[in-house]
Amino acid sequence: MPAAKGGASLQPVASGVFHSVVHPTNGTATIYQAEDGSRVLRFTNFRTTNGPNVHVYMVAADDANDNSTVRRAGFIDLGPIKGNVGDQNYTFGPELDLSKYRAVSLWCKRFSLNFGTAPLAAEHAMSAN
């Protein structure tokens, strides 16, 4: 688990497994939250195809199995992907409504393609299963 600024611990609030859409994609996406409300989206055991101008989107949908869902549902851009292989973190604030934005998509802006998506489930819902 990543540590917050100042060494404070982060608690997992949502997690999901990537599935491929137009390119092979796998790994886990987990959102951690600090006491101050700041959040970290962490990819672990992550791998996708290398591509031009790929960004990390939080999508306002339960899942995004195609390209049109991302465009139709709406999204928040967390910035360019840090690499196509390996663990990585993306920080964002408490203003992003996780009850609305329930999927992580890897979006190629150049070709308008969804490389892969991780539908997120609340951590308490996951542990209840």
Residue ranges and their predicted role:
Residues A34, T44-F46, V59-D62, G83, ...:
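Solvent-exposed coil/turn segments that connect beta secondary-structure elements
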